[in-house]
Amino acid sequence: MRAHNLNRATDLGDRVEVADGLWDRFMGLMGRRGLEVGAGLWLTGSNGIHMMFMRFAIDAVFLGRPDPERDSARPVMSVHRGLRTWIGLVPFVRGASSVLELPVGTIERTGTAVGDLIALEPAAGDVPA
């Protein structure tokens, strides 16, 4: 998937994986060695994350529910830069319904801020499910 910031005309990632099942959301990025620029993980149905058992820091963008008047773009509810391994924790973000986990520096590089609208759409080369 592609995560595109409509307000800033920037891509947060063009290789974003979707974790929509219980096991996929539980595992998240645990066990991975890192994320390349452009990669990410979209945790659906989540409004909090932890960094236990993680091997690398991440940026996290918490998204609200899709806005049908804005082509189902999701508003940014909260941003967290450089969440550190083992001690990083965001237990609950009011109004969030999903989380984008991204490489450190993505939030700064894209200028993403609370209130921006993020479109999540198939990326070039994605195979429909």
Where are these regions (language model features)?
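Compact, glycine-rich, soluble single-domain proteins
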Residues: 1-129
